[in-house]
Every structure is written in structure tokens, then in C-alpha cells.
From Swiss-Prot:
Keyword vocabulary terms for this entry: Oxidoreductase, Plasmid
Taxonomic path: Bacteria, Pseudomonadati, Pseudomonadota, Alphaproteobacteria, Hyphomicrobiales
Protein name: Uncharacterized short-chain type dehydrogenase/reductase y4mP
Binding site for substrate: 144
GO molecular function: oxidoreductase activity, acting on the CH-OH group of donors, NAD or NADP as acceptor
InterPro entries linked: NAD(P)-bd_dom_sf, Sc_DH/Rdtase_CS, SDR_fam
Enzyme Commission code: 1.-.-.-
Protein family per UniProt: Belongs to the short-chain dehydrogenases/reductases (SDR) family.
Gene3D superfamilies: NAD(P)-binding Rossmann-like Domain
Length: 253
């Protein structure tokens, strides 16, 4: 077990086919006690209840709007009251919107940036002090291939910009908090089959996309969860400020 005795906080982890949920299940199977944060409180609690049991206490599910600092503070208070420590933070929550540059409204821009980028800052700010007090930790942040290639299939330019911002923020935090033994890394998935993407691809679209992927398939949520596990565990003890592509070779630098 790679995470036995550890506690992990994962945002955006209630959706049944989502990357966050797959990560929570994988972490629990490796011995971690997990706090699932999600905008929907009932779904978060249900998801936590479905996780494999661990030796050192029950998992919890809490409501958290990552775009709202007060909501993040409240969630962190509840997590630390229940667990005492947060060893791992997975900044996974995100939303997308497939609109073009000239169609992006101010409200669109603010919401996409607030959830995808500001949310990473908000949750990191409320959990880093506890990590410092307890000798370090690991933070992994969800970016996207969209940030690297200038857009994607389901995300507009504002999504691409927000996810690019996550890359810069994570690298800056890695540099700042390295002396505190807090590692910060990013994951940049390609097209992953989740609740968001699963029903939006026709057979023709899917076949066309797969032609451009050297591994000849779309990704699964577990493909990304496996990388989160690596970054959360001591297997990556000397890795910080890194960006790990999980795209089947869709983007080879």
C-alpha cells in the first residue's frame, strides 16, 4: 500500500465517471483516508460512503465551492477537525465551456477562471499551513493538454488560459514551498472518457481523434488517477514543479 496512514483531500471527486472519483477509489485502496470535496454535498457524502474502508477511520464527503474562499476555509476546517492532518491535496475540480474567443462573456471568463485556476489557489492556501506544521506534503494540480496546445475539443480559449495559469501557479508554489518539504506538481490529461466527455463524441469524432493518438485509444479516468497516485506517494519524493502529460502521445513535445 503506497498511502497507508496518509490522509488525502480531493476536490471535484463525486462524479461517478470522473477523474476525481477514480482517484479517491485508488487512494483508498492504497490505504489513504480520503476527504471528497464537491459542489454537491449529498453526492460527496455518497461517494465517500462508497469508498473501500481503511484501518484508521472513515472517509468523509463535504460540500466545497472551490471558487469561494470562505467555502474552502469551511471545508478545510471540517477536514482537519476530522483528520487532524492533510498529507495530500489533489486540486482536481474543474469546469469547461466550448465557446470561441469573440463569444466569451465577462461572466463566462470569470467563472471558468474562478473554478479552474483560483480554486487551485484557494484550496492550496487553506491546506498548506497544516502541511507546513506536519513536515510537508504533496499537492497535485489538474491542468490540461488544452493549456499546452492552445485549446481543445471541449474547452474554449478561457479554459485554455485558466489551465495554463494552473501550470504557472503550481511551478511557483513548488519553488516557494520546497524548503517546507511540500511538493507541487501538475497533470495535463488529453481526452479522457468521463461524465463530461463520454456522451458528446460521435463514433466518427472518436475515430478521427484516435487517429492522432499514438497509443490509439482515448484515456480512462484511471489513467490519470494512476499518475495522481504516483505524485501523492513517496515514489515521487524527489519530484516537484513537474508537468506530467497523460495523453497517449497526443502532444509529443
Amino acid at each position: 500500500m503506497l498511502l497507508k496512514g496518509k490522509t488525502a483531500v480531493i476536490s471535484g471527486a463525486a462524479s461517478k465517471r470522473g477523474i476525481g472519483r477514480a482517484t479517491a477509489e485508488l487512494f483508498a485502496s492504497h490505504g489513504a483516508r480520503v476527504a471528497i470535496l464537491d459542489i454537491n454535498a449529498d453526492e460527496a457524502k455518497a461517494a465517500a460512503g462508497d469508498l473501500p474502508p481503511v484501518e484508521h477511520g472513515a472517509h468523509i464527503g463535504l460540500r466545497c465551492d472551490v471558487a469561494d474562499r470562505a467555502s474552502c476555509t469551511s471545508a478545510s476546517d471540517e477536514v482537519l477537525s476530522a483528520f487532524g492532518v492533510a498529507n495530500i491535496l489533489i486540486n482536481n475540480a474543474g469546469i469547461t465551456q466550448p465557446v470561441k474567443t469573440l463569444d466569451i462573456s465577462d461572466a463566462d471568463w470569470q467563472r471558468i477562471v474562478a473554478v479552474n485556476m483560483t480554486g487551485v489557489l484557494n484550496l492550496s492556501q487553506v491546506f498548506i499551513p497544516n502541511m507546513r506544521q506536519n513536515g510537508g506534503g504533496s499537492i497535485a494540480c489538474m491542468s490540461s493538454v488544452s493549456a499546452q496546445r492552445g485549446g481543445g475539443i471541449f474547452g474554449g480559449p478561457h479554459y485554455s488560459a485558466a489551465k495554463a495559469g494552473v501550470l504557472g501557479l503550481a511551478k511557483a508554489m513548488a519553488r516557494e514551498f520546497g524548503p517546507d518539504s511540500i511538493r507541487v506538481n501538475c497533470v495535463t490529461p488529453g481526452l479522457i472518457q468521463t461524465d463530461i466527455t463520454g456522451d458528446k463524441l460521435s463514433a466518427e469524432m472518436r475515430a478521427d481523434i484516435v487517429k492522432g493518438i499514438p497509443l490509439s485509444r482515448l484515456g480512462d479516468a484511471r489513467d490519470v488517477a494512476n499518475i495522481y497516485l504516483f505524485l501523492a506517494s513517496d515514489l515521487s519524493a524527489y519530484v516537484t514543479g513537474a508537468v506530467i502529460d497523460v495523453n497517449g502521445g497526443m502532444l509529443i513535445h
